[in-house]
Amino acid sequence: MSKKTVKISIAGSAGRMGKMLVNVVDQHVECELVAATCHPSEEGVIGKDAGLISGINKNNIFISDNPKELLKGEVIIDFTTPESTVHNSNLAAENKIGLVIGTTGLSKEQENIIEKNSQLSPIIYSSNMSVGVNLLFSLIDKAVRSIDNNWDIEVLEMHHRHKVDAPSGTALSMGKVAAASREHQFEKIKKLSREGKVGQRSNEEIGFATLRGGSVVGDHTMILAHEDERIELTHKATNRKIYANGAVKAAIWCSNKQKGLFSMKQVLGL
């Protein structure tokens, strides 16, 4: 028996991640692209063939600025902006279709809307769709549970000069995993920046350092520092195709769910 072909809609199809997603879906045997949208301000791509815009052969899927076109799919993949993502999650919930969210920089209020909408439709929300990064999260959990509070935890991340949010969603997720492993409240112990005479760090504190420059796809390191030794857990992305591959894998998994809020950890069975 042949496998089901999942109908995929891509929001933000003219962006860097959107183009990569069009490429990955085109090559995948278990899904097909049925709709592609962009922001109304992207006038240069509206009505253009999504395949040609993405650097592949013509696929006869024409980019629209109407979000309702996304409803042609069984699952929407969304790497856009927080505002567009919330709108698309409302649309998915109203029509009970799946949604995979790779957008970062959502506020707590926006995340609450996503969570509420997951009561009506299946939503996969992850700060990073990469298999490797999600394995890193598992390694962080295991490592932090194995050490005591005398080890200091710091997170270092670097991305390309065009990234607009800082620290990255992945870096924050790393901190949240570590905090949960120590049974601490992340919001109370995070230190997103340091400047001037800030005093000695506390044992509970999780510090962040952010670098921006060049074309770096994404480097993330968690440093576990003790008096006499240091552990560094690192993931380096060299091609954003890893995020697209993960997102498509998540969309196929999502197509078999009725409702609920899930993460890549569940998709990958970690």
Language-model segments: residues:
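Extreme N-terminal starter segment of soluble prokaryotic enzymes
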Residues: 3-8
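Rossmann-fold NAD(P)-binding glycine/threonine-rich loop
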Residues: 86-94, 102-123, 134
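Rossmann-fold dehydrogenase core element
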Residues: 98, 113-130, 148-153
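N-terminal Rossmann-like NAD(P) cofactor-binding module of classical short-chain dehydrogenase/reductase
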Residues: 76-77
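A short, aliphatic-rich alpha-helical micro-motif
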Residues: 69-71
